[in-house]
Design a protein with these regions (language model features):
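Feature captures hydrophobic
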Residues: 1-142
Length: 142
């Protein structure tokens, strides 16, 4: 189950991300397995829009809250556009690497440039890498 907490009903980022996640799980039922396995807290802060959300993944499903709530296992900070681009990242074509980004994809190259320049920052790595990869897998529009 993917839920927008009442605290986040007026949060555009929360609604956008929840809509993408719901649509992706509906279009790709195999992602439901990945979603059920997610555990932890993921905070996303779109600095230019001054809006933040916290995803809580537990046995009940996924809930998106307004703001940064609790201590996140992983935090993504950056502009609204690079954060939105995370749903457009291209997966590797090889079956063994299908859950990982394709370094040759134009969106992935743009994301890499944003990471190198500091326009996009990810805190909580390497421990949070499984959460990041699984979240990316569920959110990827393909």
């Amino acid at each position: 189950m993917i839920t927008v907490d009442p605290s986040a009903e007026d949060n555009g980022l929360a609604n956008m991300l929840a809509t993408i996640m719901r649509q992706n799980v509906a279009d790709h039922p195999e992602r439901q397995i990945v979603l059920r396995g997610l555990r932890g807290r993921l905070a996303i802060f779109a600095e230019d829009a001054e809006v933040a959300v916290t995803w809580v993944f537990d046995a009940e499903g996924a809930t998106v809250l307004d703001g940064i709530v609790g201590i996140p296992d992983l935090t993504i900070r950056g502009g609204f556009e690079p954060i939105g681009d995370m749903s457009r990242m291209e997966s590797a074509k090889h079956p063994l690497l299908a859950h990982f980004p394709d370094p040759r994809g134009p969106v992935n190259q743009s994301m890499w440039r944003a990471l190198r320049s500091g326009q996009l920052r990810i805190h909580g790595l390497p421990r949070g890498l499984p959460l990041l990869v699984a979240f990316g897998d569920v959110m990827q529009i393909a």
